[in-house]
């Protein structure tokens, strides 16, 4: 990764593919890294893994771009949106770079099966952070109902774009 980053001095962020690892230590699936799109990131959601993403300290952290600790579920998503909005260059390194262990204790792990107040409050807090990213870094209408319609439309549009990119982006493991 260092050699690639050194060969790309224009890169503020270098990222690549990763594996999801289950609680049993087995690979559940490999995740292909796709070209970065700020709008796809805002409207679809975070699709870059922090475990497979490297920051150039001199053009990010040392310039004051730090994590916003007010976010608990989508801290990476807000950070990447802020870096993208600031014009930082995300460079796709088309290699498998990391593993991400998925287990029930992950803060952002979904609680789809659970139907209790704690699980529902957690889901709503996650959605609230996602909505804040859309309102601050994306578009916003004064009518909340218009934002909901736009959010649904834009998410589906970028979900289709992501599917297209997944099919057409080459991948070297």
Ranges and model annotations:
Residues 1-28:
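Conserved donor NDP-sugar-binding/catalytic core segment of glycosyltransferases
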Residues 2-3, 32, 117-118:
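Glycine-rich, phosphate-binding/catalytic loops in enzymes
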Residues 4, 59-61, 122-123, 133:
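Residues within well-ordered alpha helices
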Residues 5-6, 84, 135-138:
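A general structural signal for alpha-helical elements within enzymatic catalytic domains
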Residues 108-120, 126-132, 136-141:
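Soluble, non-transmembrane catalytic domains of enzymes that act on hydrophobic metabolites at membranes
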């Amino acid at each position: 990764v260092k050699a690639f980053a050194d060969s790309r001095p224009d890169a503020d962020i270098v990222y690549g593919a990763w594996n999801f690892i289950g609680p049993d230590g087995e690979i559940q699936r490999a995740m292909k890294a796709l070209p970065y799109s700020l709008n796809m990131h805002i409207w679809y959601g975070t699709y870059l893994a922090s475990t497979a993403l490297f920051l150039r300290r001199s053009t990010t952290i040392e310039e004051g771009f730090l994590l916003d600790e007010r976010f608990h579920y989508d801290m990476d998503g807000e950070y990447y949106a802020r870096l993208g909005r600031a014009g930082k260059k995300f460079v796709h390194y088309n290699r498998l770079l990391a593993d991400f262990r998925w287990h029930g204790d992950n803060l952002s792990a979904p609680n789809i099966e659970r139907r209790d107040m704690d699980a529902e409050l957690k889901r709503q807090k996650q959605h609230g952070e996602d909505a804040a990213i859309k309102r601050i870094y994306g578009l916003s209408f004064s009518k909340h109902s218009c934002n909901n319609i736009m959010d649904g439309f834009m998410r589906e549009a970028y979900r289709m774009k992501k599917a297209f990119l997944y099919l057409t982006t080459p991948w070297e493991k």
